[in-house]
């Protein structure tokens, strides 16, 4: 959770969180070596959000284009990413609520044919 802290611009988040930077192939920003899945992205847009009245707030929406994906091969089965195997943790809302995904939560939902 250390990487969610607001820290001074010059402070190294990798050092603070005890994580290892890994070189990316297509972008200059490093990846997190300990993460089994990494996306390399290029900035598309930075949009300052506003109130309903159009007043700017101190919150930004950052959109990027994924230009490379790195996935630990142990998380792939027949080329398909196995979400539960990765045991991801998801933000659930509020200041401290999270969920963990495991295989017991899986269900199949077949999409209807497009008409």
Features from the language model and the residues they span:
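Basic, polyanion-binding surface patches
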Residues: 1-115
């Amino acid at each position: 959770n250390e990487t969610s802290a607001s820290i001074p611009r010059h402070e190294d988040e990798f050092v603070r969180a005890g994580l290892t930077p890994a070189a990316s192939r297509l972008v200059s920003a490093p990846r997190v070596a300990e993460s089994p899945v990494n996306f390399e992205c290029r900035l598309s847009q930075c949009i300052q959000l506003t109130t309903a009245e159009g007043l700017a707030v101190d919150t930004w929406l950052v959109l990027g284009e994924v230009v490379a994906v790195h996935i630990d091969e142990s998380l792939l089965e027949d080329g398909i990413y196995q979400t539960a195997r990765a045991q991801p943790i998801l933000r659930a809302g509020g200041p401290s609520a999270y969920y963990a995904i495991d295989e017991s939560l899986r269900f199949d939902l077949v999409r209807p044919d497009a008409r």
